[in-house]
Swiss-Prot record:
PROSITE patterns: ELK, HOMEOBOX_1, HOMEOBOX_2. One of its GO terms (biological process) is regulation of DNA-templated transcription. This is Homeobox protein HD1. PANTHER family: HOMEOBOX PROTEIN TRANSCRIPTION FACTORS (PTHR11850). In roots, stems and cotyledons of one-week old seedlings. In mature plants, in young leaves from first level below flowers as well as in flower buds and open flowers. Possible developmental regulator. SUPFAM superfamilies: Homeodomain-like. GO terms for cellular component: nucleus. The keyword Isomerase does not apply.
Amino acid sequence: MQEAALGMIGATVGGGGDGDAAVVAEQNRQMKGEIATHPMYDQLLAAHVACLRVATPIDQLPIIEAQLSHSHHLLRSYASTAVGFSHHDRQELDNFLAQYVMVLCSFKEQLQQHVRVHAVEAVMACREIENNLHSLTGATLGEGSGATMSEDEDDLQMDFSSDNSGVDFSGGHDMTGFGPLLPTESERSLMERVRQELKLELKQGFKSRIEDVREEIMRKRRAGKLPGDTTTVLKNWWQQHCKWPYPTEDDKAKLVEETGLQLKQINNWFINQRKRNWHNNSHSLTSLKSKRKH
């Protein structure tokens, strides 16, 4: 992986010309040595690896890590060929590597977008095929076929058009076999990775909003709670007037003075208190009406 990257960059920067093949090969080795010892080499390698990871199934990522763990041997080999560039050549190499890293970062973003879009489309297409097969035969594809994904996919509720008339998806294979249209284990692993990344992005994107809403709810709860001593005064009045717990305006004015609460807070407390004791209130009203009739 590193050798291929260094070779490609070396050929881009130091290649060309009609000189002898041996001279060109030596120039390429020197260029690789300069790149391997350049301060931006770590950034360059990280950018290459980031692009490679995008389309690499999860079960194959350890292969990349294994290659990176042995990279120091290759670096020592190339570093030994570095002879030192002139100031002008060094500046050109600096500029080239900086631009190349930027290109790789942009390429990684394009790869991510491409993989995500097509992976989701592939999942939905396979789901449609599985449903069609079930409708025709009543059979359900097994887990080993690679057709089923995690049940969490159902939560996405994505709708894609199924109008694919006139398009040949068979790829030269027998459509009745369904095999060529089903993802392999590696493809399923890649799709699962894309799904996890999408869920993480959605969670991160809405995290701040969720926290704001939660804080607003807690603020309103704190604002809605009355001090304990004030509720004691209100409860005492309630107990004394439980048969008809509807304070007059004069009663409310007196409660405002005693508790220090606002009139709106007192009104809300009595409304909520009557709701909490609705059954008892109904019984009291019925008794009161009966007494008035007699």
